[in-house]
Amino acid sequence: MKILVDENMPYARDLFSRLGEVTAVPGRPIPVAQLADADALMVRSVTKVNESLLAGKPIKFVGTATAGTDHVDEAWLKQAGIGFSAAPGCNAIAVVEYVFSSLLMLAERDGFSLHERTVGIVGVGNVGRRLQARLEALGITTLLCDPPRADRGDEGDFRSLNELAQHADILTFHTPLFKDGPYKTLHLADEKLIRSLKPGAILINACRGAVVDNTALLTCLNEGQKLSVVLDVWEGEPELNVELLKKVDIGTPHIAGYTLEGKARGTTQVFEAYSKFIGHEQHVALDTLLPAPEFGRITLHGPLDQPTLKRLVHLVYDVRRDDAPLRKVAGIPGEFDKLRKNYLERREWSSLYVICDDASAASLLCKLGFNAVHHPAR
């Protein structure tokens, strides 16, 4: 049994070798000749999986180690009788922590308290729900927009997108990309919506590039609209609008979900799905794969305020480390993908063990996802 895996899927070679012969290949462009005798294909979001790639090939199963699936033609796979699995929620924690790293950087730079801001969350799935929970743990007001969930009657006080634009100081997008249909998200943030945002608002896109109309956004910024922008995703990736990058406050190369934990979850989820598909079901404990974190433990004295939280968050991950490299190479062919391929290891907050002498600080840090314990000072 031959299994092709994306060369940038951590732990893929070790895990899938339990099931068959493993060959690691680039995801973009994928070497088509390798598909001629392969039984399974494991990809990331950079690989377009459709009829033109797989027609006439012996592939029986496709797995994508990503939460999003807009790069996969699921309908064609089903029609062709090819098994499929994604990894929903695998990188949700990573994306939430990316948003926090960005907001805390902007708050320090511009001198505001997050408690004074209302956050509008567009898309309340795996990422949106976790973001809502962590913001509300800090006492920050959230507004939710998710028409599909509202129409299904899911629990939540859902508002319209226009209402969020009018009332939110921060608008952050966490939706799939739907190019048509009743819940179309292509250019969900169009010129009209962008112009309707509150003066000084913060716009964040960490889902799919085309959810925000990049041309319209650049037009608004060029005309002097007071708006802070955080973009991790871009229309036309791996190409991007260099002029737009110059205008945004934080720009990164589609790495919001790129924690080691998030990548490992993606790999293990599709590994478990494929092992079940072939009748040799196996399960993997994530902590058996992950290395020891760079920072083992630290001690925190006193209560948790915003500056202290910012220092803790940026100790684990400071978004500026990914902004600067993109600006240096933007517009150079191949460099966007190279930044992603050679991405510096990044961990999640749970990797940091925090010893607190303040019980409320320990409790709050645990709610936020840190590994915190209370030890009273002696």
UniProtKB/Swiss-Prot annotation:
According to its record, what are the GO cellular component terms? cytosol
- UniProt subcellular location: Cytoplasm
Residues that, per the record, bind NAD(+): D146, T175, D232, G257
Predominantly, its location class is: cytoplasm
Matches recorded under InterPro entries: D-isomer_2_OHA_DH_cat_dom (IPR006139), D-isomer_DH_CS (IPR029753), D-isomer_DH_CS1 (IPR029752), D-isomer_DH_NAD-bd (IPR006140), Erythronate-4-P_DHase (IPR020921), Erythronate-4-P_DHase_dimer (IPR024531), NAD(P)-bd_dom_sf (IPR036291), PdxB_dimer_sf (IPR038251)
Reaction(s) the record says it catalyses: 4-phospho-D-erythronate + NAD(+) = (R)-3-hydroxy-2-oxo-4-phosphooxybutanoate + NADH + H(+)
Active site (record annotation) = R208, E237, H254
UniProt pathway annotation:
Cofactor biosynthesis; pyridoxine 5'-phosphate biosynthesis; pyridoxine 5'-phosphate from D-erythrose 4-phosphate: step 2/5
Enumerate the residues binding substrate: S45, T66, Y258
| Matches recorded under Pfam families | 2-Hacid_dh, 2-Hacid_dh_C, DUF3410
Q: Where are the transmembrane segments?
A: none
Q: Which PROSITE patterns match?
A: D_2_HYDROXYACID_DH_1 (PS00065), D_2_HYDROXYACID_DH_3 (PS00671)
A single Gene Ontology biological process assigned to it is: pyridoxine biosynthetic process
Annotated keywords: Cytoplasm, NAD, Oxidoreductase, Pyridoxine biosynthesis
In terms of superkingdom, the source organism counts as: Bacteria
What does the record give as EC number? 1.1.1.290
What function is annotated for this protein? Catalyzes the oxidation of erythronate-4-phosphate to 3-hydroxy-2-oxo-4-phosphonooxybutanoate.
Subunit relationships:
Homodimer.
Q: Which protein are we looking at? A: Erythronate-4-phosphate dehydrogenase
Please report the organism this UniProt entry assigns to the protein: Escherichia coli O81 (strain ED1a)
